[in-house]
A protein has these predicted regions:
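A short, structured surface patch at a secondary-structure boundary
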Residues: 64, 72-165, 171-178
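Bacterial Sec-dependent N-terminal signal peptides
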Residues: 1-40
Length: 241
């Protein structure tokens, strides 16, 4: 009986050890898989934005994550986009998001506040459409309008979906007053890429100015955008001194 009890206890102990090992192996694999599907939490990646409250930019090898946290006042939802460089590999966990290949070759913007950033970066020639072009007063961009390089695309409230689909720009940069924007929904359903820009919600001058980094990221001109913003920051600081 003692011998039988001994073997039974030994068998139960070995079974316990085996189950314990299997548990830790399974747990280890679970943790490893969890890390693999959350690459955006890599350590050491910092937000490139300092002053703007509604914008975050995180740069990774081969792609950039742009997060719009305040596209309109009282916004409850964040909008996250992935800017994919040529041959850049996007993690599976990010493929459900809007992916925009960069650098852009054509763009439609919807606010006159977007025009100066394009001109400072030297990419105004990529502008192919704008709502209410009569509102644009910039000499550089007006020349593009006058020669027919920038098309009229309706109004902000009712963008001309048919014209935009025909143009097929790489990206439409829009803005919203709230989360009810059926025109934007229709454009996205048509396969067009749309990104919200919330520069108009910023309360500080430097916060508004820092959105040039948003456009810099779209064109792969991050360094140029940073240099321009540093000059703006310096001039603003000197003015206050």
């Amino acid at each position: 009986m003692k011998t039988k009890r001994y073997f039974c206890e030994k068998f139960n102990f070995m079974k316990f050890v085996k189950n314990t090992v299997l548990f830790f192996l399974t747990f280890s694999l679970f943790i490893q898989c969890k890390k693999e599907i959350q690459p955006e939490t890599k350590s050491g990646v910092k937000n490139e934005i300092t002053y703007a409250k509604g914008l975050e930019i995180y740069k990774y090898e081969g792609y950039t994550i742009v997060k719009i946290t305040k596209p309109w006042p009282e916004a409850k939802e964040n909008f996250i986009y992935v800017l994919q460089e040529k041959n850049g590999i996007i993690p599976d966990s990010l493929k459900r998001l809007t992916i925009v290949p960069i650098p852009l070759q054509s763009i439609v913007v919807t606010s006159t506040t977007h025009i100066p950033a394009l001109e400072m970066l030297g990419v105004e020639n990529t502008l192919v459409g704008f709502p209410n072009t009569d509102y644009i007063s910039s000499e550089k961009t007006r020349k593009l309008i006058d020669v027919g390089k920038v098309r009229e695309v309706g109004t902000n409230e009712t963008l001309n979906t048919e014209v935009l689909i025909d143009m097929a720009p790489d990206l439409i940069v829009s803005f919203g007053l709230n989360n009810n924007n059926p025109t934007i929904d229709n454009l996205q359903k048509s396969g067009l890429k749309v990104i919200y820009n919330g520069d108009w919600t910023e309360q500080s001058p430097l916060g508004k100015a820092e959105w040039i980094k948003f456009f810099g990221a779209l064109y792969g001109l991050d360094n140029k955008a940073n240099t321009i913003f540093k000059e703006i920051e310096k001039e603003y600081t000197n003015t206050l001194a």
